[in-house]
């Protein structure tokens, strides 16, 4: 992670791996921000990480004060499927349900870990 300019107040953070764990909230005076995708690639549906793996990573990043943004794929089918005779325009912009499920789990796990940490102080 790096700060690209003195004007940046957070790191851009684009990555395709879960290898980077911040040492703390700040990287060269900028908020540590990590941005990766849940699907097989940017803007793709599905989940490429096991629930436990991505949840543990999110907890490690946020525990150090870092920020994690998880990019999701939206359904992009549109128009009329003449083979099926149905209108598929209702799926445009809908987040993949499997990614929604995984995001909810990650949020729950991060909140639970933060509450446990607060309780143990």
What are these regions (language model features)?
Residues 1-121:
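Mature catalytic domains of secreted/periplasmic carbohydrate-active enzymes
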């Amino acid at each position: 992670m790096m700060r690209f300019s003195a004007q940046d107040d957070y790191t851009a953070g684009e990555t395709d791996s879960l290898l980077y764990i911040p040492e703390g909230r700040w990287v060269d005076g900028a908020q540590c921000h990590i941005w990766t995708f849940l699907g097989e690639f940017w803007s793709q549906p599905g989940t490429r990480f096991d629930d436990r793996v991505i949840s543990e990573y999110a907890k490690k990043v946020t525990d150090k004060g870092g920020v994690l943004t998880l990019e999701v794929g939206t359904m992009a089918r549109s128009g009329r499927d003449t083979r099926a005779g149905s209108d598929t325009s209702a799926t445009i912009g809908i987040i993949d349900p499997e990614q929604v499920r995984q995001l909810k789990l990650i949020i729950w796990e991060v909140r639970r870990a933060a509450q446990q940490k607060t309780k143990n102080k």
